[in-house]
Amino acid sequence: MQVTDVRIRKITNEGRMKAIVSVTFDNCFVVHDIKIIEGQNGLFIAMPSRKTPEGEFKDIAHPINQEMRDMVQKAVIEKYEAVISAGE
């Protein structure tokens, strides 16, 4: 499975959340509402989630292994940095 498109849908400079993105896989499956967060060790992605009645956040969709998570995160952050650089 490959990342075939990354669309930056919203960019913000407020708080730790920097952008919301949609990622398409193999030109046939899309995951919306992936967040780019600025953490203590740099940018990372947070998968779409919902709040349970108990107040916990549970991922709606997420990679099941580290290799896939790394691939998605790399593609998303590279696209975000390219968009930010182009806007400066």
Swiss-Prot record:
UniProt cross-references to Gene3D superfamilies, sorted A to Z: Stage V sporulation protein G
Which domain of life does the protein's organism represent? Bacteria
Which keywords accompany this UniProt record?
Cell cycle, Cell division, Septation
Q: Which GO terms describe its biological process?
A: division septum assembly; sporulation resulting in formation of a cellular spore
Q: Which residues form a coiled coil?
A: none
Give the NCBIfam families listed for this entry.
Answer: PRK13259.1 (NF009749)
Protein family per UniProt? Belongs to the SpoVG family.
- Report the protein's function: Could be involved in septation.
Q: Protein name, please?
A: Putative septation protein SpoVG
What is the originating organism of this protein? Caldicellulosiruptor saccharolyticus (strain ATCC 43494 / DSM 8903 / Tp8T 6331)
